[in-house]
Every structure is written in structure tokens, then in C-alpha cells.
Amino acid sequence: MKADYNTYYYIAASKHFLTQEEPLEEILREKTEHFIANNKSIDFWIFDSTKLNAHSPNEIKTLQKTFFFPTILIISSNKKFITWLKLRLRYIFTDKIQLAIKL
């Protein structure tokens, strides 16, 4: 039986950059408030490479291993949101990933 894959878009950057040099917490808090105020479901997930465990998706663990430093990934099914984050944060990596699970 062939697995169904879901396409997600993501940004990746060093944990230090996103938590110390950029106001990531503030950006995501404002975006979350916007989603709630507009009755939209929150469709992004944050993965910290230093906190992955046995329950983390294998594709995410494999992706995190491609970076040589503690990394944060923000994953969403909404490509426009990821593009907005890229424009807002600038010095980050973006791409897409196919996951066999639905986040």
C-alpha cells in the first residue's frame, strides 16, 4: 500500500539566530493572535533539534541531521506563511518536505 505524503514548507536557521538575534517569539505570538482573531487554525509547528525525541517524525529527524548546529525548523502547510517568514527574518534557509504523516 502506497503511503500518502503531505507537502509542507519550512524555514530553518540556527537556534541562536532565531532565539537571540531575531524576535522570533514576538513574531510568532503576533501571528498566532492574528490567526485566533480571524478564526483561522494555527497551521505551523516548531521543531527544536535539541529537543527531538522518539515521537518526532523520522523525516524531521533526518532533515535536522543535515545541519551542523542546533537548529529550529518552522513547518507549515501554508507556503505564503513560510514566504512571509523568509522575508521577515531574511537570513534563513527555506525548502519543502514531504511527510508521510499529517501534522
From Swiss-Prot:
It holds the Pfam family Ycf54. PANTHER family: PTHR35319, YCF54 (PTHR35319:SF2). Keywords: Chloroplast, Plastid. The lineage of its organism: Eukaryota, Rhodophyta, Bangiophyceae, Cyanidiales, Cyanidiaceae. Gene3D superfamilies: Uncharacterised protein family Ycf54. The keyword Hydrolase does not apply. It comes from Cyanidium caldarium. The keyword Chloroplast applies. It is found in: Plastid, Chloroplast. One of its GO terms (cellular component) is chloroplast. Belongs to the ycf54 family. InterPro entries: Ycf54, Ycf54-like_sf. This is Uncharacterized protein ycf54.
